[in-house]
Every structure is written in C-alpha cells, then in structure tokens.
UniProtKB/Swiss-Prot annotation:
UniProt keyword annotation of Amino-acid biosynthesis present: yes
NCBIfam families per UniProt: aroQ, PRK05395.1-1, PRK05395.1-2, PRK05395.1-3, PRK05395.1-4
Site (Transition state stabilizer): R18
Annotated positions binding substrate: N75, H81, D88, L102, S103, R112
Pathway in which this enzyme or protein is active: Metabolic intermediate biosynthesis; chorismate biosynthesis; chorismate from D-erythrose 4-phosphate and phosphoenolpyruvate: step 3/7
The protein's assembly and partners: Homododecamer.
Residue numbers annotated as active site: Y23, H101
A single GO BP: chorismate biosynthetic process
EC number(s) on file: 4.2.1.10
Organism annotation: Stenotrophomonas maltophilia (strain K279a)
Alphabetical list of InterPro entries matching this protein: DHquinase_II, DHquinase_II_CS, DHquinase_II_sf
Name of the protein this chain belongs to: 3-dehydroquinate dehydratase
Amino acid sequence: MAKLLVLHGPNLNLLGTREPEVYGHTTLADIDQALASQASAAGHAVESLQSNAEHVLVDRVQAARDDGTAFILINPAAFTHTSVALRDALAAVAVPFIEIHLSNPHTREPFRQHSYFSDKAVGVVCGFGADSYRYAMDAALLRVSAT
C-alpha cells in the first residue's frame, strides 16, 4: 500500500463558493472525499492538507521525505506564481509530484501563466475543474502501482 499526499494551496478552502464560474461548485471536502475513495479502491492511502500559509505546506512537503509518502498531488493555487520556497522543498525531498489546477492558467491573466512547479513536476493537469484532481490521481496511482 502506497501513501499519497494531496496538498491544496491558498483559498482552495473556499471552493464551491469562490468564483464558481472559474472554479466550479464542488467543495474541497467533496474533492478530498472522492480522492480518498479513489485511492482506497486501488489499495492505497491518501492524506490531504489545505493551507493558506506557505510555511505549513513547505513543512508538510519536507516531512514527506521521511514519512513514507510515495507521491504528491499539489494544487499550489496562487503559490504557483510566487513560491520559490515551496518549489525548493519539492525539489529537495525528491518525492514525485503532479501539479494540479482547476482552471487552465494558460487562458487566464498573464501573471497566472507562469508556474514555478511545472518544470519539476512529473506532469501537470489543468482546466478540467474538480476532475483535474481525479485525472491526476489516476496518473499517480498508475505510477505507484508500477513500482
């Protein structure tokens, strides 16, 4: 059984009510529940964490190096465009990760079109709303099952 870690960045706790025309009506609790069911059905465990604080996410990524985490799914949200610290933590722990976005950042404002994570990620899933998480989990489960 592999352990997967799902990290949600700032403002994702507001999913379902924040700009639903951009991010949809699905809540973060709904997403986490669906991911837990998906991982469990494949015989794996998942832990989810949302934080609006960069240092909390950095601390959790650093802990992943020693706690048996096999794969990370991360939606850095606004930190996508600003967080060298989170990028450096992911690079330092060397746990493979997939970058996730509900919307497609490439179709949004210019400042949202640069990611500090994409070049380090195994892959990027974006633009499919809450399904972006499901597709990323599918890919992660295939990878951990192959090892």
